[in-house]
Structure formats: C-alpha cells, structure tokens
Amino acid sequence: MKLPNVRETIFSLKSYISAIMALYLSYSIGLPRPFWAMTTAYIVAQPWSGAVRSKALYRLVGTFCGSAMTVYMVPRLSNSPVVMTAAMVAWVGACLYLSVLDRTPRSYLFMLAGYTAAMIGFPSVSDPSLVFDTALARVEEISLGIVCATLIHSIVLPRGLAPALTLQLDKAVRDAKLWIHDTLSGQNAEQKDRDRRVLANDITQLRLLSTHVPFDTSNLRWTAGAVRAMQDQISALTPAVSAVEDRMRALQGNDQPLPEPVSQVLADISEWINAGAKATHETAVQLRATVTQLTPDIDSRSSWRDALLASLMARLRELIDTYDACLALRREIRAGLAGAPLRAPRAERAANNNSTLHRDHGMALLSALAAGVAISVVCAFWIGTAWSNGATAAMMAAIFSCFFASQDNPVPGIMQFLVYTVYSIPLSALYLLGIMPAIHSFEMLALACLLYTSPSPRDKRQS
C-alpha cells in the first residue's frame, strides 16, 4: 500500500470542496435529489484543471440534449415497452457510436447525451406525466455539479498540464532518438521493434494530454499550436525511420556493405541526434547538404542499388528535417512557457495544421451494438418479470456501456467497478443505518462525508 502524495491529497480535497459546494447549493435551491449534484462533481473531477475545463461545456450541452430527447420520447412511447426500449437503444447506440469516433473532448457531448436519456428516461416510464419535471431537475443538478467542479479546479490551486506535457514531449523525443540511433547503427530487429512500440505509446499519451492544452490555466495554452505541430512532427518520425530502416535492410542484403561515405553520414547523423538539446540547426543544414551530395543521379541506365541508395538519401533528408523541426518546436514551447511570444511563421503554420485522426468505425459500431444488446437484455428481463427496480438496472447498463466503450476490452474495468461496489456495501450500510440518522445539520453532514471522501492509502498498481 502507498500513501497519497501532496498532489493527490490536494486533488482529493478540491474534489471534496466542489462536491460539498454543489450539495449545499442543491439543498439551498430545493432540488429534489441533491446527491446527483454531489456525484457529478466527483465524476467530472480531473487532476489537471485544463481537462476539467475542456469537458465542462460539452458535458453541459450533452446533458441538455439527452434530457430534451427524454422529454420528447417518454410521453409518446411509455405505453409500448418494446418500442420504448428500441427507441432508447437506438438513441444510446447512435450517441455512443459518435462518441467513440470523436477522439476529442467533444466526444463527451455525445456520451452524455446518450446515457443522460437512459438515466432520466427509464425511471420515468412508470409516470410519464412527471418526465419534464424530472428532466429539468436532473439538468439542474448535473449542471450544478459540473459548474462547481469547474470553478474549484480552475481557481483553487489549479494544476496545469505544463509539467506533465513537457515531460511527455521530452520522453517522446528521447525515445525517438534511441530508435533512430539503433536503426542507423544497425541494431538487431528485436531492439528496433521494441523502440518503435515505445515511441508509438508516447505518441498516444501525448495525444491524450495535448487535447486539453487550449483550456489550460497556465502559459501552456498559448503554445497550443506549437504543441500540435511538435506532436505531428514526432508522429512523422515513425514512417521516416521505418523507411530508412527498410532501405538499409535492402542495401545490406546478401551481406553487402554500405558504401563508406554513406556509413560515415549515418554515423554523423546519429552523433547529431545523440547530442539531444545541444543539436544545432546549423549541423542539420550541413548534414542535409552532405546527404544531397551523396544522392546519385537516376536515369534509365541506373542500377537497382543506385535507386535504393537515392531513396535512402531522400528518406535521410526527411528524417533530418523532421527531427530538426522537433527540436525547434521544443525550444519554442520552452520559450512560450516562460512568457515569450512564439515566432509568427511557425505559429501560423501550426495554427493552420489540420491533422486528421484515424476513425475506427468498426470499434465504434461494436461499442454501439454491445450497448444496445446489454440494454435490450436488461429491459427484456425487466418487462418479462415486472421487476420493480428494473429501471435502475437498465439505466446502469446504459451508463456502464458508455463509460467503458473506449476500451478494447471493457470487461476488466466493469468487473473492477463491480468488485469495489461490493466492497463498499459495508461502509454504505454503516453510513445509512448508523451515521446518517444521527445527523441533523448540513455541517455535520459535510464532516461525515469528509471521512469517506478524504485521500486514503492505495495499491501501488493503481498509482
């Protein structure tokens, strides 16, 4: 077990303050279920303030859209359980499909629109005349929790993305440097494959962090364009290095050595890259000129080996330019964090960058179908057995399907959620039967909540 550190303790206390603030305002306004506001404040909490802010607006809009669909759907279909189930499955599935396709904070708009409709719609089918009041109350409670969490995490000791993002940028450049060095020095294929996988993971983590940069509370948000440009340059290193590796393998086939000048320029490039932050643009220009001089002229009489050599030189120029751009952008980001303005040409090029992310329609469709099947099975059991709490089960099926849809294998996450839910039953029983009946003021309620919302020892595997 590992005790929480200072940052984790501060994050936990900020989450507690935002939740208690939402709970107090809910009681003051007279909302019917204040616990929704408190729960929402914890659900939207993120360690970095930029992540909370980036998702807040989309969560609000998604909640409103889901509630509006519920108000439209339930009064018209509540008398036909099968049609009502089919309509809800279609809505949740469509929203989840769009959410999985959209790999930006905007995906939360579609996700919230999906499971908010299920969260409000299923419990309202028994009395559809109250669906508008229920939807309005849920929107107010959830919106209050989102606003309170956003305010507290943005104002009280906000934690910027800059330290985490710059560490990830430096790690990506360092891992790229290692892969390039191993490729140019002719390391074994197993080592190069391992280097490539490490860099691919770095690019993924960098993508997840960089989406929140424009919403950050530090100077990092002014470098959003440079961060996106550097992320694209690091991503471009992957095909560039792979292409160099392929050409070198082809040229060295049948135990043929590389020409001495080519081996020398490969060593020079490797030395320049290993210099790290000390690598200069002037050296890159010299290396590019040397590579250009070594490029053979290709005509109809050229051999296949000459064509391979010319292709290798072209890929080396691309590699030099891309790595040099990474270093230049990293220097600009460092200057931007210190408050210096970014250079206009590079900033404009970054702002005009429109990189397209891969959209996995198969994964999105599979997630939507899984959610539809889960909701349909639960609703069939609910309708067939006239289960009094079937609405809660159908609602939770929709929520779990949406929460874990982005994972390749959501089963471990859902099972872990179930295990910790079972573990929480004794503590919940203690509060429900022993502590809550003795509380007669909001102050005592806040103190009682502090006991189970404060930071606690955690397993190292979860850190």
Show where each model-derived region lies.
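A transmembrane helix-and-boundary motif of multi-pass membrane transporters/channels
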Residues: 1-215, 222, 332-335, 339-342, ...
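Intracellular, membrane-proximal regulatory regions of polytopic membrane proteins
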Residues: 1-2, 129-137, 151-340
